Amino acid sequence: MKVEELAESISSYAVGILKEEGIEELFPPQAEAVEKVFSGKNLLLAMPTAAGKTLLAEMAMVREAIKGGKSLYVVPLRALAGEKYESFKKWEKIGLRIGISTGDYESRDEHLGDCDIIVTTSEKADSLIRNRASWIKAVSCLVVDEIHLLDSEKRGATLEILVTKMRRMNKALRVIGLSATAPNVTEIAEWLDADYYVSDWRPVPLVEGVLCEGTLELFDGAFSTSRRVKFEELVEECVAENGGVLVFESTRRGAEKTAVKLSAITAKYVENEGLEKAILEENEGEMSRKLAECVRKGAAFHHAGLLNGQRRVVEDAFRRGNIKVVVATPTLAAGVNLPARRVIVRSLYRFDGYSKRIKVSEYKQMAGRAGRPGMDERGEAIIIVGKRDREIAVKRYIFGEPERITSKLGVETHLRFHSLSIICDGYAKTLEELEDFFADTFFFKQNEISLSYELERVVRQLENWGMVVEDHHLAPTKLGSLVSRLYIDPLTGFIFHDVLSRMELSDIGALHLICRTPDMERLTVRKTDSWVEEEAFRLRKELSYYPSDFSVEYDWFLSEVKTALCLKDWIEEKDEDEICAKYGIAPGDLRRIVETAEWLSNAMNRIAEEVGNTSVSGLTERIKHGVKEELLELVRIRHIGRVRARKLYNAGIRNAEDIVRHREKVASLIGRGIAERVVEGISVKSLNPES
């Protein structure tokens, strides 16, 4: 089907944009599904990676905008939101307004009311409803990318509640779900009252195989071929032909070790001097130096310990072909789109406190990355196994079906978190209405069991915590409404309220309080971390909680204290690399912990204000910047971080006025180029105080 045939549905101007993007003709499944896309009905599209699901959704959103509607495009990760936003901006050429909302959970982002297409995450979209963003009711089309993540232990419940809330808010709402894998597609379609389209067509054919004890067996339809080959040879023969290789390892350590090993191969084919500098721009610690050396030689590792900037450098360089091999942990498979000619899965196991096999759906996500449209004649996905797992790899993973998608909403923590918001948002004023709401969820569709007992227990718990009152009908208290808007677990809100109502806190006391909450990620206590126990005992009078060392909570408590001590070192301006070495974490881990702690510190401070406790008031900004209180005025200035601020402060430069007055001195301390940018920023701000 030629794209010109779409002009009647999306306008000739929109067709012009598609042609500018090099799209002259639709893929076969796109041509088959396009009628359903323009029907206006709810729709579920289950198609492999790169088969063109997103383009179909874009056409639906463009058509919606032409009709005067507004679309919300929901993705699972912030990084994906940024990627989609950049991709959708092409539609601005025909007058559409594209927006993105991924930040502060308390913000309503009212400026997005003028946008035609808004990209966001499911958590942010849910928080926009909780904070009563005025424009959210005007959304007429909801696109859910990766709707199979209803199955996610962590994110699935929020996605399910978001869809249920939005369908209740706007009875005429159109929902479009996109999925690469959906074994029980009819069940999800029934829940959404949707039509569905399923295709296994791929723009680049996929050949899958196993490498077992030096023998590679490839399965291409009904045919199979075999040959003797080593793992390293599989990598090199692909790189030699200018193909990209994506290797999946089960652990970070494995990913780093394999990337270092393979960099000796890729070094024969590339040299990346400039990229090395880009990797070391934000951090020059041990892991970053190892990554920079790999990248210089044309290989890279990719895992959650990398900084966001480093990940972007690696991803962009791999897409351009400057990096030939990326060795990643499985998290990459569900994240950004990085196709490669050959995907090699080094293990079907992952370690999660214990060793267990990955899901078939996880393998399918990894294998789905094989084959770059327009560049490769075919993609290859190869599993490396021992003799014991060969049959499982072939029967279950290569020829087997992904697991059925099941709702994860029935867990108490999810019920507690979402029941409070459902009451606060006015969807339920009685227990019966709360049950009615949950009867519209995917959980009820699948299980057809009442949650009345669990919901009553959750509501009584919220009553005991002072977040809900029941007097003829259910209503949120001031605390309950605040906790819902802050987007924290009600248990987190209760812990904050309980402690802050009765005691003032020191820095370490406040940081430990943050680390006590279920919303906070905690560091693992290693065998070599006996110093944590000693520090906990020394600081016991400053902590809001100190269990007996014989209690079952004691090990958990030590992990809370270790995380709090890590944050304390951060706000005391300890060197970033020293912190990472001391606590056994990577720079990306530290940034993630800091970001979560900043969000929770803000929530803690808001609750502290409600109970008249001022002891935690300056902490959020200190966590954000990683500084002592005396540097706050300097780090608020653009281009001045914790290291530059300390240099300036120690030299007697204390504020913006000092910087402008002593320009030459500032230039000698932080470099002339940076100093000029800082001064320019200060001048602009003084001319435009609101910028």
From Swiss-Prot:
Q: Which SUPFAM superfamilies match?
A: P-loop containing nucleoside triphosphate hydrolases, Sec63 N-terminal domain-like, Winged helix' DNA-binding domain
Q: What is its EC number?
A: 5.6.2.4
Task: From the UniProt entry, list the residue stretches annotated as the region Required for helicase but not ATPase activity.
Answer: 400-691
Which Pfam families does the protein's record reference?
DEAD, Helicase_C, Helicase_dom4_arc, HTH_61
Which sites bind ATP? 30, 47-54
Tell me where the sequence motif DEAH box sits in this chain: 145-148
Listed under subunit, the entry gives: Monomer.
Summary of the function given for this chain in its UniProt record: DNA-dependent ATPase and 3'-5' DNA helicase that may be involved in repair of stalled replication forks.
Indicate what this protein is called per its UniProt record: ATP-dependent DNA helicase Hel308
Gene giving rise to this polypeptide = hel308
